[in-house]
From Swiss-Prot:
Catalyzes the cross-linking of a glutamate residue and a tyrosine residue in the PqqA protein as part of the biosynthesis of pyrroloquinoline quinone (PQQ). The keyword Chaperone does not apply. It comes from Acinetobacter calcoaceticus. The lineage of its organism: Bacteria, Pseudomonadati, Pseudomonadota, Gammaproteobacteria, Moraxellales. The keyword rRNA-binding does not apply. This is PqqA peptide cyclase. Keywords: 4Fe-4S, Iron, Iron-sulfur, Metal-binding, Oxidoreductase, PQQ biosynthesis, S-adenosyl-L-methionine.
Length: 384
């Protein structure tokens, strides 16, 4: 199937699931500890070459923490030689001035550093790592020193949302060019911890108001910092156009080579091919996994006849699966969905007390335990 299928313009290379932090909102799969057979340097080179030949132009290096890969500089250099615009998505842990210099030499275009909170104590508690804040702060200074655009990301949730002023002030102190204040998206570990992470409507309204006030202040000062506030669809009545549509632009390759239309799709009971077994072009155009939710033939009638279907593409398939057990159901976020009460229930639960210490932190021990108790689909290498 190639007719009407666009190009995979954005390649996400999940280099590893390994990470020194234990963030309870991580989007990695709950059973990540079971997936250890990472692609080799040469295998990643081959992925980049194929993707570039297909028309991919932007390449994101993520994880886990991509810096645990000692060949990261080699991977960046190869991608740069192929003409990719490259972006490193990192916690900053494992970054040093020497590595920043080496990555600059290799041709890396962009570094995005994530923080957990503006307060060092809260930051390190959420990261599950001592001195994480100190390391991140210093690395941000060095990123700026080496003339990278300063892009900071804060995952916002009920345990840090009331610090929104301090978060923005920290970003200004670090001379950030762009700040992404992204309300937690509930996939992977974040979905497991949803009751302890989802902010209340009141918290969200306050945070958005304060962000808008800062935007006006910065605009009046002709300040270059750009504040991006990403609202959670749990407080919307229409679903987001997830990944701009299934298999339309994004191509994700997991650490073990599984090819996915988005990084959260691994949890679905759908067979996805592996780049070790199939060419990327065959995966993109011919595989059952990538064609599964293209178009609108899969949609239930209410979605198929909806005038918004060409804008939201039916919403998020992973969210539909997590909440209803069937990825083909209408996204519960949609106010027209017969499952919308699940979202309303989640909003009500946000009013409950949920101490930080009750969160399940992302680490190998918890991953192995959850793998034994959760109903997680087991994928095998499949034919196209």
């Amino acid at each position: 199937m190639t007719e009407g299928v666009g190009l995979p313009l954005w390649l996400l290379a999940e280099l590893t699931y390994r990470c020194p932090l234990q963030c309870p909102y991580c989007s990695n799969p709950l059973d990540y500890a079971q997936h250890k057979n990472e692609l080799t340097t040469q295998e990643w080179f081959d992925v980049f070459d194929q993707a570039r030949q297909m028309g991919a132009v932007q390449l994101g290096f993520s994880g886990g923490e991509p810096l645990v890969r000692q060949d990261l500089e080699q991977l960046v250099a190869h991608a740069h030689q192929q003409g990719f615009y490259t972006n490193l998505i990192t916690s900053g842990m494992g970054l040093t001035e020497q590595r920043i210099a080496d990555l600059k030499q290799a041709g890396l275009d962009h570094i995005q550093v994530s923080f957990q909170a503006s307060d060092p104590v809260v930051n390190d508690a959420l990261a599950g790592s001592k001195h994480a804040f100190e390391q991140k702060y210093e690395m941000c200074r060095l990123v700026k020193k080496y003339d990278y655009p300063m892009v900071l990301n804060f995952v916002i949730h009920r345990h840090n949302i009331d610090q929104i002023e301090q978060i923005i002030e920290l970003c200004l102190e670090l001379n950030a060019d762009t700040v992404e204040l992204a309300i937690c998206q509930f996939y992977g570990w974040a979905f497991l911890n949803r009751q302890g992470l989802l902010p209340t409507q009141e918290q969200l309204t306050r945070a958005e108001r304060i962000t808008n006030e800062y935007r006006e202040k910065l605009k009046a000062q002709n300040h270059p910092c750009k504040l991006i506030f990403v609202v959670p669809d749990y407080y919307e009545e229409r679903p987001k156009a997830c990944m701009n549509g299934w298999g339309k632009i994004f191509f994700t390759v997991a650490p073990d080579g599984m090819a996915l239309p988005c990084h959260a799709a691994r949890q679905l009971p759908i067979s996805f091919p592996n780049v070790r077994e199939h060419k990327l072009s065959d995966i993109w155009y011919k595989s059952t996994g990538f064609n599964h939710f293209r178009g609108d033939a899969w949609m239930p009638e209410g979605c198929r006849s909806c005038p918004d279907k060409d804008r939201d593409f039916g919403g998020c398939r992973c969210q539909a699966y997590m909440l209803t057990g069937d990825a083909a159901n209408a996204d519960p976020v949609c106010g027209k969905s017969p499952y919308h009460q699940m979202i309303e229930q989640a909003r009500a639960e946000s009013q409950l007390v949920a101490p930080l210490q009750n969160l399940v932190f992302r680490n190998s021990r918890n991953s192995k335990s959850l793998s034994a108790t959760q109903n997680i689909p087991v994928h095998t290498i499949t034919d196209i």
